[in-house]
Amino acid sequence: VKFFSQYVPGNERVITIEDTMEIRYSVTNPGKDCIEMRVNDRFDYADAIKTSLRLNPKWIMLSEARSKEVKYLLEGWSTGVRGMTALHTDDVRNIPDRILNMLETRVDADRLENDIYQAMDVGVLIRKKKNEAGQVYRYIDQVCFFDREGQKNKIIMAVTDGKLVLKEFPESLL
C-alpha cells in the first residue's frame, strides 16, 4: 500500500485508516491532500470507514483488511471511491474468497460478491525471499485483474511466478 500510494495524484484526497501508523502517507507524500485516521478500541475500522465517506475522499487506504470492516470498505469502493488495502492470502485468485470469508453473514457475502469484481481492479501478491547473502527482499509474484463483464465475474492473471503472462489487456480493463 505504501509503495503504490506514491502514484496517487496530489490533488486527490486520500484517507488512510490504520491501527499502527505504517503507511505514513503525509510523510511519504508531502503536500498531498491527506487525512490520517488511527483506529482504537473506541473508534474501530468500521467507524473510520463510515466517517471517511463523509469527508469526500477519492481514495481510502486501509493498512490491512482483517475482518468485518471489509464490508464497509467494499461498500465505499462501490460508490466510486478508489482504494488500497493489504490482506493475507497465498494466491491472488483467492482474494475474493478471502474477502467473502471476512464478512459477518452469508447474506452479506451473497450481496457483496459481485461488488468485489466491480469495485476492485487489481490484486498483487508480494512474496519474500532470501538472496545468497542472506538478505531478505520482496518481489511481485502475482498480479491479477478483477472484472465483471455482463453477469460473469472474472479473474485475469497478468503476472504468475514473477513473469508477465498477459500478452494483451482485455478491452474491459482499459
What are these language model-derived features?
Residues E75, M102, E113-Y139:
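Helical/strand "switch-coupling" subdomains that flank nucleotide/phosphate-binding cores, especially
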Residues N131-L174:
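NTP-binding/hydrolysis catalytic cores, primarily Walker-type P-loop NTPases
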Residues M37-V39, T89, K128, F145-R148:
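Active-site donor-binding loop signature of nucleotide-sugar glycosyltransferases
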Residues S52-L55, E75-R82, M120-K129, G150-K152:
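Short flexible/disordered coil segments
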Residues S5-D115:
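Switch/coupling sub-region of P-loop NTPases
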